[in-house]
């Protein structure tokens, strides 16, 4: 083995070997165990959330594969309609083109080119992370098979009355010209205004105070043009007499009713609210309750129409409402119209006041434009009938959430579910399988030929396919079964569905998880007709945040590519990556500045195993992950520790009883074997409970502290003793090898590369013949090998040796200087342990002699260590240079007195305490406490040595 651990020298070659040998594919034996990779968007590269997700899934798959399950971990990518289309449109913009210049067909060719380039990048990253996915079964949400499955699902749901076309309110992105989902809307806290406007009462009506108008508060005066009512709370006594009467809409002159609705808060503004059902989601619900007309006043750009479009709630045209709008606002942008409308209201004496008001402004997460609630014709899935069985599946335990608290989030969403808008006004995506004749009649089918045959439409009937595409979440909602060959009843579908675990972030429980459950249970049935669930367990993890706890996003410029931590990256390359191809290029300068501050030298190379172990160690259930580069560095050191331990073992492993020779186990051998059994049981238990943090912690504790720090040291006296019995030396060598071999198997799901590299060399010494560690059996604890007596003896020894180390450090006694020991309160067990381990203590702790004192015996002035009730005394006389040590201590005491005075003065200065941030003050207080404690310790030592 190389002297130093170089991850890059081993990682790629091992991955290529595993893949070429087909080790990632199902091995054909055992009960199935399936995970479908949540398909990353084919829009560039994987981020830290994907890296975390992959580390968790691969740990599960490698663990279950070693347990003998027939594992399938299937990879793939998502076409990510809106995000991908935007990226390609931006590339065209740079060349002075747009998609309409190219036309739909040529534009889609460009997107496919981008997909091939980007998808290859994602596959490379997944490989580099060591993910043991079955590449022979890689899928893409728009490959031929999945496209057929999407059409099939749409047609079946339509035939079952669960998909319909309707005119409803959607989140409309006025820049991208498409409906977007709630997930793609970000609510920004902004300082805005509340306009208080006079709405004249019609027909001579008056308020209780005798006024002939109502004052209505609004944050969007431009939507006044589409008002359908003014609402008041039914219990608001000020307005009860006016319910059912009318106001005249300012600037427009249209009569609109005064209605009573609990939605109105009497404490907000004047208690009167304008209702614009076609441009506000809450108003739309009020409109439904009161059968109000829907008046659309904007076009797709959010420019004011010359006359409103009036509809009834069922989407039919309302011909009773006056749709005339003032000509001066026609074709004005909504925000330009706002200024004009407010000015006109003011001129007519209808503007009462403008108040400052904090509000949430919805913006498209990709375009950055203010989202407009807009009335359009869209396709919808009727979700309530699908939600009921999906709720029952979680209630009765067929699907379990880990941690369980996320079930409540799931239930609250599902019990208040709204119909799902599945159409998008894009070109990139699954085109909706619906056709229209020239009269506007719609026909749904798998293809045009089927539609013509089913509805007996001759060649003379001109059909036009719907231009819209399906929401990306629709195709990804079919992911667990469409990727296994559905609608064909393939062998893979029969064996590997339902899948076992879905690993996902909490932020898409509703958008993806719930929809997968609903669609799968409706479309996939068992032989007895009962619905299949898509997965048995949903493991929900938190978001991976940056070191400051901020969510990672391209717009914040804090996204890390996991491969940059694996392979390292220069500062210049990191800046280029973070600031190029941005949706909002104006943020580039700010992002460059913060990147230089955080990574002035770029990012060092840590290797895949260190990054994966970091992810697993941070995976406490359900909490957000604050990513810490310091942890990665620490686990890179852990890899070095394992590497160096393996080199020591290989150096000592020439005769370890692999051919059946006699051997004898020392106390230390029995102890480490016993500790190994406990570690095997603990790591297994925690992995089965999805506690990757506790599993990795148990493994780290065993390998670093027990095996490397203690057992390797305890093995040396046996192996270095030329007079030791051959059987005992062989027993220690055998234990060194076999415990390391098992520890490597335990660590393999977390750190696949380093464990494979070392295992290949260790396995033959342990008498194991196998091609790869990944197909070796998972270690199973043997309770018969737990040796409580050996554990007790070694813990006693460790306490004694640590006590002596501390005395050497405190008293500045060199590590090679032999120590005479006096022992007080030594019981029979203590004396037995001393006698049995005398040789070991003399070699490892450099103990010169032991003297057991009786109750009446007086010990010389000594430094003391406690091991239970046993007092271990190290006499100071003769061990230290008294004058030199006193001089050294005086120097330290003076330095600490100065530090205590300096920090104490700072903290007693009111000017400093009043101005400094709390964190700085806390740091200074901690520094003072530390210095005071150190001063007390050194003063005590000085007194003890002076008394010698």
From Swiss-Prot:
EC numbers: 6.1.1.9
This protein's UniProt keywords: Aminoacyl-tRNA synthetase, ATP-binding, Coiled coil, Cytoplasm, Ligase, Nucleotide-binding, Protein biosynthesis
Primary enzyme class: ligase
InterPro entries the record matches: aa-tRNA-synth_I_CS, aa-tRNA-synth_Ia, Anticodon_Ia_Val, M/V/L/I-tRNA-synth_anticd-bd, Rossmann-like_a/b/a_fold, tRNA-bd_arm, tRNAsynth_Ia_anticodon-bd, Val-tRNA_synth_C_sf
Coiled coil: 877-947
Short sequence motif named 'HIGH' region, residue ranges: 40-50
Principal cellular location given in the protein's record: cytoplasm
UniProt GO BP: valyl-tRNA aminoacylation
Location(s) in or outside the cell: Cytoplasm
Origin: domain of life: Bacteria
Motif ('KMSKS' region): 551-555
Residues annotated as signal peptide: none
GO cellular component: cytosol
A molecular-function term among this protein's GO annotations: ATP binding
Annotated catalysed reactions: tRNA(Val) + L-valine + ATP = L-valyl-tRNA(Val) + AMP + diphosphate
Residues the record lists as binding ATP: 554
Gene3D superfamilies in the record: HUPs, Isoleucyl-tRNA Synthetase, Domain 1, Valyl-tRNA synthetase, C-terminal domain, Valyl/Leucyl/Isoleucyl-tRNA synthetase, editing domain
HAMAP family: Val_tRNA_synth_type1
General function of this protein: Catalyzes the attachment of valine to tRNA(Val). As ValRS can inadvertently accommodate and process structurally similar amino acids such as threonine, to avoid such errors, it has a 'posttransfer' editing activity that hydrolyzes mischarged Thr-tRNA(Val) in a tRNA-dependent manner.
Subunit structure: Monomer.
UniProt comment concerning the protein's domains: ValRS has two distinct active sites: one for aminoacylation and one for editing. The misactivated threonine is translocated from the active site to the editing site.
Family (UniProt): Belongs to the class-I aminoacyl-tRNA synthetase family. ValS type 1 subfamily.
Protein name (record): Valine--tRNA ligase
UniProt organism field: Pseudomonas putida (strain ATCC 47054 / DSM 6125 / CFBP 8728 / NCIMB 11950 / KT2440)
Classification of source organism: Bacteria, Pseudomonadati, Pseudomonadota, Gammaproteobacteria, Pseudomonadales
Gene: valS
């Amino acid at each position: 083995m190389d002297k130093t651990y170089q991850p890059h020298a081993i990682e790629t070659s091992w991955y290529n070997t595993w893949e070429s040998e087909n080790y990632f594919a199902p091995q054909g034996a055992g009960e199935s165990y399936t995970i479908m990779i949540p398909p990353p968007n084919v829009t560039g590269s994987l981020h830290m959330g994907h890296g975390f997700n992959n580390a968790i899934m691969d740990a599960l798959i490698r663990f279950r594969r070693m347990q003998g399950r027939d594992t399938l971990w299937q990879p793939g990518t998502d076409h990510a309609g809106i995000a991908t289309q935007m990226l390609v449109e931006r590339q065209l913009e740079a060349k002075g083109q747009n998609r309409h210049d190219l036309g739909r067909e040529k534009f889609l060719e460009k997107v496919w080119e981008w997909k091939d380039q980007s998808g290859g990048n994602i596959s490379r990253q997944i490989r580099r992370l060591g993910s043991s996915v079955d590449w022979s079964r890689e899928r893409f949400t728009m490959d031929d098979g999945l496209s057929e499955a999407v059409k099939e699902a749409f047609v079946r749901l339509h035939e079952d009355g669960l998909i319909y076309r309707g005119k409803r309110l959607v989140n409309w992105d006025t820049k991208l010209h498409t409906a977007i989902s709630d997930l793609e809307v970000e609510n920004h806290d902004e300082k805005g205004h509340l306009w208080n406007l006079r709405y004249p009462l019609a027909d001579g009506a008056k308020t209780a105070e005798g006024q002939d108008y109502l004052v209505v508060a609004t944050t969007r005066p431009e939507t006044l043009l589409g008002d359908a009512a003014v609402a008041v709370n039914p219990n608001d006594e000020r307005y009860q007499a006016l319910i059912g009467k009318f106001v005249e809409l300012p600037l427009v002159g249209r009569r609109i009713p005064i209605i009573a609705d609990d939605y109105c808060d009497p404490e907000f503004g004047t208690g009167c609210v304008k209702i614009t059902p076609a441009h506000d989601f809450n108003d739309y619900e009020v409109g439904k309750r009161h059968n109000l007309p829907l008046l659309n006043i904007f076009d797709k750009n959010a420019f004011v129409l010359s006359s409103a479009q009036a509809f009834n709630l069922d989407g039919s045209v309302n011909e009773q409402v006056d749709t005339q709008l003032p000509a001066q606002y026609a074709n004005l942008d909504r925000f330009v119209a706002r200024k004009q409308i407010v000015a006109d209201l003011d001129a007519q004496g209808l503007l009462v006041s403008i108040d400052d008001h904090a509000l949430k402004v919805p913006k498209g997460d990709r375009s950055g434009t203010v989202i407009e609630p807009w009335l359009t014709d869209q396709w919808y899935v009727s979700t309530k009938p699908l939600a009921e069985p999906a709720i029952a599946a979680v209630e009765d335990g067929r699907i379990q959430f880990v941690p369980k608290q996320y079930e409540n989030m799931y239930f609250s969403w599902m019990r208040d579910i709204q119909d799902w808008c599945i159409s998008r006004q894009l070109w990139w995506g699954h085109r909706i399988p619906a056709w229209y004749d020239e009269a506007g009649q719609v026909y749904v089918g798998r293809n045009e030929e089927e539609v013509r045959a089913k509805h007996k439409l001759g060649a003379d009937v001109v059909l036009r396919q719907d231009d819209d595409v399906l929401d990306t979440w629709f195709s990804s909602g079919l992911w667990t079964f469409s990727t296994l060959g559905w609608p064909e009843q393939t062998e893979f579908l029969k064996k590997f569905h339902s899948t076992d675990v879905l690993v996902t972030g909490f932020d898409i429980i509703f958008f993806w998880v719930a929809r997968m459950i609903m669609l799968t249970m409706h479309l996939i049935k068992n032989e007895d007709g009962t619905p299949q669930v898509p997965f048995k367990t949903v493991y929900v993890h938190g978001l991976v945040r940056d070191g400051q706890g901020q969510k990672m996003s391209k717009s914040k410029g804090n996204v890390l590519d996991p491969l940059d931590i694996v392979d390292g990256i220069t500062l210049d390359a990191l800046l280029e990556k973070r600031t190029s191809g941005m949706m909002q290029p104006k943020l580039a300068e700010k992002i460059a500045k913060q990147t230089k501050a955080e990574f002035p030298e770029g990012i060092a190379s840590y290797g895949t195993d260190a990054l994966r172990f970091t992810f697993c160690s941070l995976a406490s259930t359900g909490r957000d992950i604050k990513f810490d580069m310091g942890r990665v560095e620490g686990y890179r050191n852990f890899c070095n520790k394992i590497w160096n331990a393996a080199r020591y073992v290989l150096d000592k492993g020439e005769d370890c009883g692999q051919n059946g020779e006699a051997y004898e186990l020392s106390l230390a051998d029995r102890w480490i074997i016993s500790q190994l059994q406990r570690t095997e049981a603990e790591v297994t238990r925690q992995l089965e409970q999805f506690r990757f943090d506790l599993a990795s912690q148990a493994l780290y504790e065993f390998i670093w502290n027990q095996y490397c720090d203690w057992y390797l040291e305890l093995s040396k006296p046996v192996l270095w003793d030329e007079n030791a019995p051959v059987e005992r030396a062989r027993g220690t060598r055998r234990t060194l090898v076999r415990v390391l071999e098992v520890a490597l198997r335990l660590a393999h799901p977390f750190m696949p590369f380093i464990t494979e590299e070392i295992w290949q060399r260790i396995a033959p010494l342990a008498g194991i013949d196998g091609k790869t560690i990944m197909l070796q059996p998972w270690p199973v604890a043997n309770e018969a090998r737990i040796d409580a007596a050996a554990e007790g003896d070694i813990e006693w020894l460790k306490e004694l040796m640590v006590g002596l180390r501390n005395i050497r450090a405190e008293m500045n006694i060199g590590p090679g200087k032999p120590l005479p020991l006096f022992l007080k309160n030594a019981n029979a067990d203590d004396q037995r342990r001393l006698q049995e381990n005398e040789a070991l203590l003399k070699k490892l702790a450099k103990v010169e002699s032991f003297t057991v004192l009786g109750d009446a015996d007086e010990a010389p002035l000594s430094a003391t260590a406690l091991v239970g009730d046993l007092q271990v005394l190290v006499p100071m006389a003769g061990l230290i240079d008294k004058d030199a040590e006193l001089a050294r201590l005086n120097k330290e005491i003076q330095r600490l007195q100065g530090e205590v005075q300096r920090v104490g003065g700072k903290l007693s200065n009111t000017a400093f305490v009043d101005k400094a941030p709390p964190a700085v003050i806390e740091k200074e207080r901690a520094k003072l406490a530390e210095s005071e404690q150190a001063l007390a310790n050194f003063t005590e030592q000085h007194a003890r040595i002076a008394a010698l």
